[in-house]
Regions:
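Active-site metal-coordination/substrate-binding segment of hydrolases
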Residues: 69-170, 175
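Metal-dependent amide/peptide-bond hydrolase catalytic core
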Residues: 240-416
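N-terminal capping segment at the start of a domain
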Residues: 2-29, 134-135, 227, 383-387
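A non-catalytic alpha/beta surface segment that caps or lines the substrate-entry region
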Residues: 23-72, 76-78, 82, 93
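Phosphate/diphosphate-binding glycine-rich loops and adjacent basic-rich segments that engage nucleotide
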Residues: 200-226, 230-233, 237-241
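Acidic/histidine-rich catalytic neighborhood of metal-dependent amide-processing enzymes
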Residues: 125-213, 254-270, 274, 281-288, ...
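Glycine/charged-rich beta-loop-alpha catalytic/anionic-binding loops adjacent to active sites
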Residues: 125-140, 224-228, 350, 382-386
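Short, conserved micro-motifs enriched in small and acidic residues
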Residues: 30, 140-151, 234-242, 391-398
Length: 416
């Protein structure tokens, strides 16, 4: 197996899911500390400098510049160590299989149902016949988002160690927790990180490039009702769960994730629970246009007010928090044009045409770019993320390490 494949499989086996229910603590899960220590140990073994793991499971390290290139700006890369919480993620049993075409059964899920991928679910498989794929065994997610990105970066450093003749500026590396629950690397010490600009590696298929993300907010709707014996409830009972249902019905049904694509925004009901006396619904709202996000916020506030007026009591309350912003607002500034053009050139050097897509999500760069680390998003080469059908093609995993080598070499020259 190649170095990057070995590392990827090893990282996948370390469970490190984040948990939105404990998001008030960073990291939200103890397992992310364990993943951070695994990555830090690999960095130290390779000879990276200034390797630090802080109390929040942030890993920061540096790779020194080639001789004569010490005065160039530091190039930064960032990946996240957590995996998604929406699917089972412990234990993870990655497997390497050769795709022979048609339907590929990878295993069975925890209820015994067949788990497979096919050209019907993933048309990209048509050109992957004969390739090795890293898949799940059907019982969990894989974790390519974002452990493929981590493996690529660490493997790149291993290449520099083995081939010191390869030229590169000083490189800063950050591996951060809780990306999947919207934390957005909020506690990354950018002064210690020390990068002038750079990239996150958290995208999908090989060649994908993103400088546009959603603007994002989370919305917490709370209902406080009044429980009365159902036999004598007339004119008295206020059912908190019913109030939440009325509220949800006022949101446009066509603007849900399952009905949207491209630049369409949406409202997403993440979870709901409750009873007569108390109920809650947690939403996220997403849109590439911040003005539309603001309109969505107002619609939810107005919907709650309407329900309260109908009931005749202040049953519903709405709490809104911004999560991240569209990184295009920063990356498209003329002084950062090199982030796009150098990525395009590096992809071409490995025979891939770069595809720019509006990302229907966010990356750590969505916050970091606004905090002073302008960064666009590169491929991590995973497909069907966050579920049991997730897979990573080995040729793409290996090809991205080559792409990163070419990309870094382009930064051995001053940028305009």
């Amino acid at each position: 197996m190649s170095d990057v494949l070995n590392r990827f499989i090893a990282y996948c086996k370390v469970s490190s899911q984040s948990n939105p229910l404990t998001a008030d603590v960073v990291p939200s899960t103890e397992s992310q500390h364990q993943m951070a220590e695994v990555v830090a140990a690999d960095l130290r073994e390779l000879g990276a400098e200034n390797v630090v793991v802080d109390e929040h499971a942030y890993v920061v390290a540096h790779w020194p510049a080639s001789k004569g290139l010490e005065d160039l700006p530091t190039l930064g890369f960032c990946c996240h160590i957590d995996t998604a919480w929406q699917s089972w993620g412990n234990p993870v049993h990655p497997q390497v299989v050769t795709y022979e075409g048609g339907k590929l059964v990878v295993g069975s899920d925890r209820e015994g149902r067949e788990v497979y991928i096919s050209p019907e679910t993933n048309p990209q498989l048509e050109h992957m016949v004969g390739w090795q794929l890293v898949t799940t065994d059907g019982t969990s997610l894989l974790g390519g988002d974002d452990k493929a990105g981590i493996a690529m970066l660490v493997s790149l450093l291993a290449r520099y160690k083995e081939h010191p003749e390869l030229k590169h500026p000083r490189i800063a590396l950050a591996f951060v927790p809780d990306e999947e629950i919207g934390h957005g690397a909020a506690l990354l010490d950018l002064d210690a990180f020390g990068a002038a600009y750079g990239y996150t590696i958290d995208g999908g298929p090989f060649g994908e490039f993103c400088y546009e993300t959603f603007n994002a907010a989370e919305v917490f709707v709370r209902a406080h009702g009044l429980s009365v014996h159902t036999g004598t409830a007339k004119g008295q009972m206020i059912n908190a769960s019913e109030a939440i249902m009325r509220f949800h019905e006022l949101l446009p049904p066509a603007e849900r994730p399952e009905f949207t694509e491209g630049y369409d925004g949406f409202f997403y009901l993440e979870r709901v629970n409750g009873d007569c006396e108390s109920a809650r619904a947690d939403y996220i709202i997403r849109d590439h246009d911040q003005a539309k996000v603001e309109r969505r916020k107002q619609l939810m506030v107005d919907a709650a007010a309407y329900v309260n007026k109908q009931i005749g009591s202040e049953v519903l309350s709405v709490e809104i928090h911004d999560q991240y912003h569209n990184l295009a607002d920063i990356v498209l500034k003329p002084e950062y044009a090199h982030l796009i053009e150098n990525a395009r050139t590096a992809y071409k050097k490995v025979g891939v045409e770069m595809t720019c897509i509006p990302m229907r999500g966010g990356t750590d760069g969505s916050q970091l770019s606004f905090r002073g680390f302008p960064c666009a998003n590169l491929s991590a080469c995973y497909y069907n993320a966050h579920g049991v059908r997730e897979f990573v093609p080995v040729p793409e995993l290996e090809g991205m390490v080559d792409m990163l080598e070419h990309l870094v070499e382009l930064y051995t020259h001053p940028q305009n």
